[in-house]
Structures are given as C-alpha cells and as structure tokens.
Amino acid sequence: MHPSQAVAAPLGNATHHQEMTDHGKKQLTPHNQHRISGGFGIEETVPNQRNGRLTRQQNPRLLRTLLNAASRPAECEANAVRKIVRLVARTGCRTHILHVSSGLSVDVLRQAKAEGLPVSAETCPHYLTLDCDHIPDNATEFKCCPPIRDLREQDALWAGLADGTLDGVVTDHSPASADMKAGTLATAWGGVSSLQVGFRAVLTGAMRRGLSLADVVRWMSCNTARLVGLDDRGDITPVLRADLAIIRPYERFVVDATALESRNPICACDGMTLNGVVTRTFVAGRDALSGVREGNLIVRP
C-alpha cells in the first residue's frame, strides 16, 4: 500500500476497524486525502450449524461446495463490504476494498459511490476469467480466497468494471510450490499464480464482451497507479516514466505453465488460449531483454 497512512487488514471486530478508520481519518492531509487511508480484505466465514465450525472433511474435493456454499458464500462477502461502507460513512476515511468477487458486493459499492462515499475497489483476473463450474475436482491451483465463483457473479464483476463501480484489476499474484499445492482443497495453499498471464487473461475476457485494450490498460495500469500515488508512471504520456509493453492484442497463444518465468510451473490458466502476444517490454525506457540493441531518440517528444 502507499505510505500515506495506508493500512490493510482482514475484516474482524467492528470496534477494531472503527478505531483503525478513526486513526486514518486523523492523519489525512490535503496532500494525501485523495489516496488510500484504509485498505480492507473482505472475508467472512459461515459457521457449521452442527459444531460452530466448518469441518475439513466436508466435501474436500469440490471447490463450489467447500469454498463457496460451505464457507465463503457471496452473501458473507457482501455483508463484510456493508460493514466497511458503514464505517466509511461514519468516519469519512478514504478506503479501498480488495479482491471483490461477487455481484452482491458490487451492488453495495455501487450504492456507496452513488452516495459520494470515499471508497474504491478492485477485483482480480481469476474472478473475471474462471468459474467454479468448470474447475476439475481437487484442482488446487484454482484455490484462493475469496473463492472463484460462478458465471453469474463473473458477469456482475464485468458490469462493475464497465460502469466504474470497480476501479481496477490487480493480479493478487500468489505463487506456490508443488508441495504447498498438494493435498485437497481443504489443506492446500490458497493462491493463484497470475502475474505473467493475468493481463492477457483479462484482455481476452474484455474483447469477448466488446471491451477494448484501452479499457484493460485503464483498469490495470492507469487507475492502479493513481490509486497508490505512482504519479510518474501508469500511462503513455510525455514526461511519465516509460514502462511499456509492445503487444499484439489479436494474436493468440496457448498458456504453457512449464514455459512461464515462475519458479513453480503451476498456473490456473494452463492450457487456456488467450489474446495478446507480448513482443517487447521496456522498463524506464530500457528494453527489459538483455542483449537487445537500444534505439536512438530521433524526435524529441
């Protein structure tokens, strides 16, 4: 998070978060009031009616049952967002909601923004491009929290991006070794490795819905840079830092997890056909690939 008094925490005791947001409100200044003062990951669980806890033995191979219906249904996520929005309304604290995965949460955020509350929110590539009904049993590479939900929820997330309710898309890149992903969905490490393919996965989904490359760049670069105060980058504009990728948006490729740069060849997009072949990458104006001859400046911008 940006150093302008940003905090991050899971949803827990409401009194604790009231104290946190009060603290953040006190530290706002004219310089940083448009940036994040509080950041919250949204997560609540449903207790098992029999013993007050969700048992690990309850359908440990089915992602839909174990992570969606049994422990983290969309209603719980939306309830968590409602609690945060109420605190924002009471304190005026600039707040960012992480990892939105459900349409119910989008509805809450849409209303909050309509009321002028200082709240922003993001979702992730896996919530936009994968759905729980097409995930094989015990495929632990898809395990994450909040969980990957169904197509109805996915459509609602895209609608939230299109109308500006959701401000951006972030990778939430969380790689893991084969040992960490071993076992069942109940025991395996939760996290999706998406850094190298996340942008292309979102681009593919956007193009299928009639959205553009410019939309994806706005969600995954421009808006995110502004959100955390990286004012010197994030857009293609004179005087900004030249962090650029040269991409062929209509050229397609098949994801091969073993060919990715990650140390661990585990990827939820393995085998998917995606749009967007990257041909060159520049970091601060320099070609990121070693041994590539640099060009000369011909015309001053």
Where are these regions (language model features)?
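Detector for intrinsically disordered, low-structure N-terminal pre-sequences
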Residues: A6, T45, D215, L297-I298
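Histidine/acidic residue-rich metal-binding segments in metalloenzymes
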Residues: M1, R35, G39-G41, P47-V169
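Short, strongly patterned local motifs
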Residues: M1-G24, L28-H31, I36-L54
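Glycine/Thr-rich phosphate-binding loops of Rossmann-like dinucleotide-binding domains
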Residues: V106, T129, S177-D179, V254-V255, ...
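C-terminal cap of metal-dependent C-N hydrolases
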Residues: T184-T187, P238-V299
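Ser/Thr-centric signal marking residues that sit
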Residues: T123, T171, S221, T279-T281
